[in-house]
Amino acid sequence: MKEFAKIERAVHAIAPSVNVSNENNCVVLRGELDNWDDVVRCGRAAVSKKYLGVINDITLRGYEQKVRLPKINDKLYDGRKPDVLIVGGGISGATIAHELSKWQLDVMLVEKGYDVAVGATSRNDGCVHVGIDLTPKLVKHDYLIKGNAMYDELCEDMDVKFERTGHMMLMYYKWERLLMPIVGLWSKILKIKGMRYIDRKELLKIEPEAVEWARGAYYMPTGGMVSPYKLTVALAEHAAENGVHVCLNTAVLGMKVEDGEIKSVETNRGTIYPRLVINAAGTYADVIADMAGDRTFTIHPRKGIDIILDKKKGNLAHTSMSKMPFVHVPANWKETKGKEGLLKTLMKGKSLNETQKTHTKGGGVIHTVDNNVLLGPNAIEVPDREDFTTDMESIQDIVTKQKIIQDKLGMGDVITYFAGERPATYEEDFVVRRGIFTKNIIEVAGIQSPGITTAPAVAKDVERWALMFLGKQEKVKVNENYNPKHKSVPHLADMSEEERDELIKKNPAYGEIVCRCEEISKGEILDAVRSAVPVYTVDAIKRRVRPGMGRCQGGFCGPTVVKILAEEKGCSVEEITKGNDYSVILYNKTKKGAETNV
């Protein structure tokens, strides 16, 4: 009772009108407030290890969540009775599908979007993290260590580029090197392999364009980079090749639950009757858990904006670079040259406690596997679970902040930017577990950073739990036709002249360049759309083989891509969308065009 009274006082200090209760050993908050930041603050104030989690049902006055549902409504999947229904086609759902495809199971993956990897998975920096910012007691720390070690083999099997580039924490002050014993001990506690101090001479061998103020760095070689959307697409295609049904434009609308068991799942494409449900629904994971009667957590979306620079600036980063979050590097560093003392510096920088409260790594200057440089992200709490908007103020702030890490970049180098949302819980940890109140569900929720890194390890546990549950009725047999390897679409830009010649002789479509910026051929586009998970949209093809991701952002190749997709699908160009059903590119022919039949 003392702990609950403490929570109640903390919440009421922020918002006296909020009702606080203990239900099923969860702290439940209800009420209505005028400020979203206050809603989030109340949720954080209610966190306690003595309870299962925080269910924050405080609403924002005047705000109503608008869910982006697909236009389609039919009975395509009505009456289906899969062994496993995976809800969510992000990195978590796709990796789980990949693992379950090894077994003789009827597995369905449903995704409400028009493609896999359209949520948080495609809207992040693609870092395979080392975990220096975590603590050993976190669930996500354990999965990070295991997942990081699995990436080389996983990406080789999926034929997806992975680079173990390492992560740098640059040093501005001489005294930062004195922290080596502490940082070294902390890295051992966190099981980070190979972390070491490097001086400026060695730093320049790895990062020739390193900022002038960097005296050295803490280097963590186990950090890496992957294209999160290409990996997710490969995993989904691989699962489909091995028998998993990937169902796009399919939204879960409700569930029928009796005696702690999910009996049926209602979607816009019919009612499904699964034996087991796996909840990997990203920012909607708490909504799905609530439908299933198994909710012990709340997702509060945290938006982050990332910036992509032109490839001509690709030499500015070969790893991911940042500084210690509590170290202040002055904007006029060329004048001060690191002469400020330790106490003065720490007073100007963020405290470690403040850094942890922001719940973000602070972003950085990051090398990508496609040889662009990525800047960001920032972190903004928002009420909308699908807020992908960007704003110039945030973009300028990110560029200004990261210019301290790499002073050779500028606004003129920016070619695009995008926003994504971290599906954070108030406990700031993953919820990966079997159902507590509902027996035939597995929760994979709260998967914010480092979710890309942890996905392979999380999927292993989910696979084990699924087999244990399904095996109670009958032994699950191995899929004898399982193929562990996936072949991705060849990328012309990465090939030698000899390799290109050989490929073009086999398939002349590879000799027709569609996207000049990224050197993407018609053959690549056709092979991408003819895959096990075909998606006839411009953005889906962009994620798979990159037409439109260069300097001109599709200004040259866009119309040709639309034409190729229309021809391949056998439809008019007006029917090809940029992304979802609502993102129309061409509405109709012009009057003159209609008359001349163009």
Describe each PLM feature range:
Residues 2-7, 23-28, 32-33, 37, ...:
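C-terminal catalytic lobe of FAD-dependent flavoproteins
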Residues 25-26, 161-169, 204-242, 262-264, ...:
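Helix-loop-beta segment of a Rossmann-like dinucleotide-binding subdomain
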Residues 79-109:
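N-terminal Rossmann-like FAD-binding beta1-loop-alpha1 element of flavoenzymes
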Residues 102-123:
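Glycine-rich FAD pyrophosphate-binding loop
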Residues 126-206, 360-363:
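Dinucleotide-binding Rossmann-like beta1-alpha1 core, especially the glycine-rich loop
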Residues 135, 140-145, 172-180, 218-237, ...:
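Short beta-strand to alpha-helix junction loop
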Residues 240-252:
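A conserved beta-strand/loop element that lines the FAD pocket in flavoprotein oxidoreductases
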Residues 255-261, 266-376, 380-389, 493:
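Flavin-dependent oxidoreductases
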